[in-house]
Regions:
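Hydrophobic, small-residue-rich alpha-helical packing segments that form membrane-like cores
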Residues: 160-228, 232-246, 255-264, 268-282
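Active-site His/Glu-centered metal-binding helix of metallohydrolases
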Residues: 81-89, 317, 580
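Bacterial N-terminal signal peptides that target proteins for export
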Residues: 1-10
Length: 944
């Protein structure tokens, strides 16, 4: 497609800006072609399919079925059935009765909840089977058969339906927090007169617990049908054969006669602004959402050049607008804590779009937030964006697409699957990244800043406005009513709003060029296929070039020490330590504040950041290959010249206090605080931050600690992994790393914070709007860390996940899910295992007792053979996939360089050698019953 075609497309795009001309009046444009590497088709019965051969990851495939069906299609007495049906898809089908599907897939390394899952929305339901090993043709065929059964053969047995009612009721209980109640209160007002007003996917518990069995079957057979279904299969297989299989298998499904019309429910327009307000005793912040509604681009236009141009303009507008918002929040007394602006779907609807402004305010700061975010919209409406802002946004868009283009041969199966799901559900274009990149390169010079300004001004309007205001319900906090909100907006319109002044520095990143050092020694690493350099300043560099990605270089510099070298029992110092990672990022680097640095780096794929953890300090950086020297400059500055910005720190303090003042009253915060206090014996570093703590934080001390931790490059190992050439990297390493200050000191890890010993119970009542109990049990101890022990603890963790799903979730119907976590530290040989879940307070003790009993059964008897086999198969599959991940090798090398060994060498041999008897002996050694902490928050309904 040439520049002339793009310019002609612009004509249509600007017709579209005027709220979309009717399709019959608009000049017709051809749809962009579908990527020739995709097998796309529609069967005679109406079913759509997408098939693509792809080898990232190797020997793996994705199987998805997308349904243009969701809660929006429910009748009043069916509310919740779309979501209920999604659950039932995992409880028996024609070819996989009962739990045989789950068992079969898990036996092949496909883990439920990780590789096997689904979701239900207002207008869509999507199921997936991910990371399927394709070497096993029977497994591939079976995954297609699972999709077939989900399409037309879910069993829906009475007994299975009844058993799932409790699970969904507990899912509702888990989700019923302040955000959920806010949705339930505001959506009916925002969507008054539309089906969207009362179709939250979770439904009503009255329907969920009482609907007749046949109602679910009727809903299934009415809406799960070929014309609403898309099959998406991506992976390492023969695409010809896969396409033929799909045609044969899914072509058998009959399209129902006299099928019900799939209605896309409209959202009515409104001349007068709609105002939705809700306050909640557990809300953590004041938030305003302002929607300027407009009609969406017609589906038939989304797949043309018009759709691509509009997406481009939305992209650059979003970048420019949100950069301004970020700049505002860097200043003290900003009118809002955080903000965002974008154009897209009107909240949850597919049939109405909106230009959306979001601002999070302080207590009693709703009017300030509204005025602040509207003032920025007004500034754009009057003056538009500047040419220099647009140049940076355009460069960013081009850089993003360039990176995607360079990585076109490394794009993962799941990314293609998600793209094609959106194409099936929403329409649009999928011409392939080669064409998209060429389009962007042609569009960006053809679309001027004036065109972008004309476009964004068309989106800013008082007509069709919806305003949602939400926040905490507490004494001393008041909110404006609708009249006051509208008056505030009018006041902004009457203000003398000044145009935005774009201050851009032309100074170099580094004001004084460093004096380069040298690589004094180069040897081949003993494992991992690495090269090791010793630098003239004593720093060590480990290099692992890879071909896993074509345009990604990562660097991790690590050193022993961290918090452990400081007095973590000092309450004031602890505040500095735990806020350090946030605060050091506020100021930018060198002579550039954060906003200025963001402008200087526009169009570059590059970052560098410092962080401090309990046992190490680290600098992580990444870049596209073209930005390697820029990344190295940022690394140099991260070590030598953190920029101080007192205004940004003052703004951060204000925002942090405003955020914490309400969050500290939420049940989630209170439970987290109780858990950490109990687990770590009230250690100041582990306790949750409170609003009153913020003023005690010392910017001076934080910068001092950061400088101390980066003062000696010789105590660091610099690990490079990615798409680089060693010879090309060498001069940058010599200039920007070998030049770093260093000395002969070498630090070790100090004393780590320990978990409390003994049997400890912390059970307390917590008033809540919707009562639920949260249960956490933590077993801990000490054990020699090595690969074998690490693997056995990981196996136990994953086995218990299976056991708890089967018992606490499925048999008891007592919770949406039990979370498990195992942690094993190579630093001090400490381990812990925890399980946690939400439940009905009446079931709290019974389920807690059973959870302990199920764990001890596995400890004493060993895992069941079937569970043991499932977990090992998954671990072997995951390990094979990890072999081509840069992040995996970065972590393996990090652990090895710090002296903690590596979890890759002999992984498969060690895992395969572990037996059930080994598991039993190991578990008994760990779970002696001496050290167990239980924290239980029992919810009680708040008194009115």
């Amino acid at each position: 497609m040439n520049l002339r075609m793009v310019k002609s497309g612009l004509v249509l795009a600007f017709l579209a800006i005027a709220q979309w001309v009717p399709a019959q009046q608009a000049p017709q444009m051809e749809a962009l072609p579908i990527d020739p590497n995709v097998r796309y088709g529609v069967l005679d019965n109406g079913l759509t399919y997408y098939v693509r051969h792809n080898e990232t990851p190797k020997n793996r495939a994705e199987f998805h079925i997308a349904q243009k069906v969701g809660s929006i299609l429910e009748n009043e007495d069916q509310r919740g059935l779309a979501h209920f049906l999604e659950h039932m898809a995992f409880n028996g089908t024609e070819h996989f009765p009962g739990k045989t599907m789950l068992n079969y897939l898990e036996n092949n390394g496909i883990k439920f909840g990780v590789d096997l899952n689904a979701y239900t929305g207002f207008d869509e339901t999507v199921y997936r089977i991910s990371n399927v090993p394709t070497q096993n043709q029977n497994l591939v065929d079976s995954c297609l058969l699972v999709l077939y059964d989900w399409a037309c053969a879910i069993s829906l047995n009475d007994k299975d339906i009844d058993e799932e009612r409790g699970v969904i009721h507990e899912e509702w209980r888990t989700r019923a927090d302040a955000d959920w109640r806010t949705w339930e209160a505001t959506v009916p007002v925002m969507f008054e007169g539309s089906q969207y007003a009362n179709r939250m996917p979770i439904g009503t518990m009255e329907v969920v617990m009482n609907f007749p069995y046949q109602a679910l079957r009727d809903y299934y057979h009415k809406w799960y049908r070929p014309d609403q279904q898309g099959i998406i299969v991506i992976g390492d297989f023969d695409a010809d054969k896969m396409e033929a299989q799909i045609k044969e298998l899914f072509g058998k499904i009959k399209m129902p006669e006299n099928a019900a019309e799939r209605i896309y429910y409209n959202v009515p327009d409104n001349k007068e602004p709609i105002f939705a307000f809700h306050k909640d005793k557990e809300a953590a912040y004041t938030r305003v959402d302002i929607y300027m509604k407009h009609d969406p681009m017609p589906r038939e236009m989304r797949g043309t050049i018009n759709g691509a141009i509009t997406d481009y303009m939305n992209g650059v507008v979003g970048i420019m607008f949100n950069n301004r918002i970020t700049e505002i929040t860097q200043k003290p007394d900003a009118p809002f804590i955080a903000g965002a602006i974008f154009d897209g779907d009107f909240f949850v609807s597919k049939t109405k779009s909106a230009f959306t402004l979001i601002a999070v305010g302080k207590d009693n700061g709703a009017i300030d937030a509204i005025k602040g975010i509207m003032r920025e919209a007004e500034r754009i409406d009057r003056y538009g964006f500047t040419a220099s802002e647009y140049d940076r946004a355009r460069a960013t868009m081009l850089s993003n697409y360039e990176n995607l283009y360079k990585e076109r041969n490394n794009r993962k199966n799941v990314d293609y699957a998600e793209e094609y799901i959106r194409h099936f559900i929403d329409g649009g274009y999928i011409p392939g990244i080669e064409m998209e990149y060429n389009l962007i390169k042609q569009m960006s010079p053809a679309i001027t800043v004036d065109m972008v300004n004309q476009y964004v001004k068309s989106l800013i309007s008082e007509d069709n406005m919806v305003i949602s205001l939400t926040g905490p319900d507490k004494e001393g906090v008041t909110y404006p009513d609708k009249a006051q909100v509208l008056a505030a907006i009018k006041e902004v319109e009457a203000e003398e709003v000044a145009p935005y002044v774009d201050k851009v520095s032309n100074e170099p990143l580094i004001s004084k060029e460093p004096v380069a050092g040298k690589v004094t020694k180069s040897v081949a690493g003993k494992k991992f296929g690495t090269t090791e350099w010793t630098l003239s300043n004593g720093a060590k560099v480990v290099l692992k070039p890879t071909d896993f990605k074509s345009d990604e270089i990562t660097m991790l510099a690590v050193s022993k020490g961290g918090y452990s070298l400081y007095n973590t029992s000092d309450p004031t110092l602890a505040l500095d330590l735990k806020s350090l990672n946030e605060v050091v990022e506020l100021g930018g680097l060198g002579q550039f504040g954060k906003t200025d640095l963001m402008k200087v780096l526009a169009g570059k794929q590059v970052s560098s950041s410092f962080s401090l953890s309990e046992a190490q300090e680290s600098v992580f950086a990444s870049c596209a290959t073209k930005d390697l020297e820029t990344m190295m400059q940022l690394v140099y500055l991260t070590f030598t010249d953190l920029h101080r910005d007192d205004e940004a720190f003052a703004a951060w303090k204000e925002q942090s206090k405003a955020a914490l003042v309400n969050y500290a009253n939420t049940p989630q915060y209170i439970f987290s605080d109780s858990l950490s206090a109990t687990l770590y014996n009230h250690n100041p570093l582990r306790r949750q931050m409170k609003a009153e703590d913020i003023d005690q934080i010392s910017y001076d001390r934080i910068l001092q600690i950061a400088k101390e931790r980066t003062a000696n490059a010789a105590d660091y190992t610099f690990i490079f992994v990615g798409s680089f050439n060693t010879d090309s990297l060498k001069p940058y390493v010599e200039k920007y790393i070998a030049s770093l200050p260093a000395n002969k000191n070498r630090e070790k890890v100090g004393k780590l914070i320990e978990t409390q010993k003994g049997i400890i119970n912390n059970n307390y009542n917590q008033p809540m709007e919707t009562a639920k109990s949260t249960v956490y049990a933590i077993y801990s101890g000490d054990q020699k860390y090595d690969l074998r022990n690490y693997l056995m603890l990981s196996i136990l963790d994953q086995v218990m996940d299976i056991v708890y799903t089967e018992t606490i979730r499925e048999e008891e119907g007592g919770t949406y899910g039990v979370g498990t976590m195992a942690d094993f530290s190579p630093v001090d040989n400490s381990w812990l295992f925890l399980f946690g879940f939400d439940t009905n307070p009446q079931d709290e003790k019974r389920l807690t007792d059973r959870a302990h009993a199920e764990l001890m059964k596995v400890v004493n008897e060993g895992p069941r053979e079937k569970d043991f086999a499932k977990v090992k198969e998954y671990m072997l599959k995951k390990h094979a996939q990890n072999q081509r991940e840069n992040s995996y090798w970065r972590e393996i090398i990090r652990s090895n360089e710090l002296g903690y060994g590596d979890n890759d060498t002999n992984y498969e041999e060690t895992l395969n050698s572990i037996t059930i008897d080994d598991m039993k002996a190991f578990s008994k050694k760990l779970f002696t019953g001496k050290d167990l902490i239980e924290v239980i928050m029992t919810g009680v309904e708040k008194a009115e």
